[in-house]
Every structure is written in C-alpha cells, then in structure tokens.
Amino acid sequence: MLPAAAAKLTADEDLRALDELRFLWLELTNRCNLTCAHCYAESGPRPLRKDVLTTADYKRLLEEAAALGCRAVQFIGGEPTLHRGLPELITRARALRYEHVEVYTNGTVLPDTLLSCFVDNGVSMAVSVYADDPDVHDAVTGRIGSHRRTICNLQRMVVAGLDVRIGLIAMDISKGRVDKTVSFLRGLGIENVRIDVTRSVGRGGSPPCRVGSPQRGSPAQVQTW
C-alpha cells in the first residue's frame, strides 16, 4: 500500500472513531441546595437559569445516544438528586442497556426511595467532598451541616454496596488536609478518591477561587439546615 493511501485509511478510521458516542453527560438541573464557592455552573437554591428540558426530553436523549452506541451516562447538575425524574431516567438508561450509569452528587440528599433505586439499578456514585474537617467543608459549600449530611450518606452508600468514588477539590483552604481527607475517606471504606482543581469559570473564576481560597463568608452567606 502506498504511504498516501495508508495515511488516508488512517484518517478515515479516525473519523469513524469520532462518530462513536462513548459517554453522555446529562445536566438535569441548575438548582442546588448548596452554594459552593468554586461552582463552575454557578448553581444554587436560586439558579441563574431555569430548567428547560422535561424528563421526556432526557429520555429521548438517552434513546438517541444509545442508538449511536453510547453505553455510559452520568447525571449531573446543579444537584441531580433534586430532579424528580432521576429515578425514571436511571431505570430507562438500564432498560436501554447502558453499562455504566453514574450520578454525580454533593451527597446531602438521599431519601430511602432514591437509595433503593440506586441499589436496584447498580448505579455508581460520584460524590464531592472538600475536607475531613466539617468547618472547612461547610465553608466551601456555604451550608453549615453539609459535611455531616454528606458523610452520613456516604456511609449509607457503602453499607448498601454501591460503587462510590470521591471528587476531592484541592484548594488553599484545604490544601493542608488533602492527605488527612484521603485517609478519612479510606476509613469509611472508600478507596477511589480523585483529586481535582477548580475551574476558572462561573464562581470558580472569582479571585478567591482562582487561588483556591473560598471563605466562610458572613452569616448571611452561610446557611444552616
């Protein structure tokens, strides 16, 4: 085969590879019960943008992606557990033979019915944790008590046998606690901890977050449950 023909064949193979959809991210809502200082989506209790897609719309997206060969989906937000259609979408994804179904959550919202849905459908969990220290974690989320809720629900996930991984964002406010936080999480039975950095978009683009130093804020900024 001539070099030019071989190069064209390789290029054609690359193009076919690009036509294959491997992973689908579905942002179900911009709403969130927390107001994390570094949030790239600027999510919060009063979201900047309204939800425009219905559960039926997301079902169609799952179906279209499956028809293109996609076999992995992650439900994100905002906080995806606030979306009432999440259980229905998870069930539909499994019916469409998605092999990997993951929910990326802050871990504060986990009623028994939702936990049962996760277990019944073999859902993988990705959970944001910012520190082993409750004060540091709550300073990032802007919600006193959020650390307690997240850790409690992480323990419930582990006991239920769910596959759990942690997204640990390294910031100046927590940089001295990263190793301690990893050890703390391993003590809960969670080995899969991925350390990440802030994104310089949304609230993450503000000066405090660019250097990774979200502050606790005034009493008006830090809410309680």
Q: Which residues are covered by each model-predicted region?
A:
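Conserved alpha-helical substructure of the radical SAM core
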Residues: 1-122
